């Protein structure tokens, strides 16, 4: 990764937060979710035009939604059936208001590389 790579750990007490992308172009992001309970459902808003819903994930599975590679994996295996969204996540230039329902049910990390046009 380069010096413009930003990993963001989501504190379980937080359900809403902001990400400031200092770049001039949308930056595809990678979301890693490790559930603390089976079959949790999580809804993420602010990283796509429509909400991203994640479901059918078991405790301690590692779910990766990779906007750059356009993949959804659970424990390194295809898991697109657990992903319900029209597009892959990205961080827009400027301030992004992100909201995650049931954030306390998982450990969540969002990563992106700043992009410039």
Residue locations for each model-derived region?
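Intrinsically disordered, low-complexity segments enriched in serine, threonine, and glycine
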Residues: 1-117
């Amino acid at each position: 990764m380069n010096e413009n790579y930003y990993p963001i750990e989501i504190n379980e007490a937080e359900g809403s937060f902001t990400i400031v992308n200092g770049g001039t172009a949308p930056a595809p992001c990678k979301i890693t979710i490790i559930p603390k309970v089976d079959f949790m459902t999580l809804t993420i808003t602010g990283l796509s035009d429509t909400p991203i819903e994640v479901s059918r994930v078991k405790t301690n599975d590692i779910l990766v939604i990779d906007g750059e590679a356009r993949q959804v994996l659970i424990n390194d295996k295809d898991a697109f059936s657990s992903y319900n969204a029209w597009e892959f996540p990205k961080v827009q230039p400027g301030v992004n208001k992100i909201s995650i329902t049931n954030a306390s049910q998982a450990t969540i990390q969002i990563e992106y590389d700043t992009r410039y046009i």
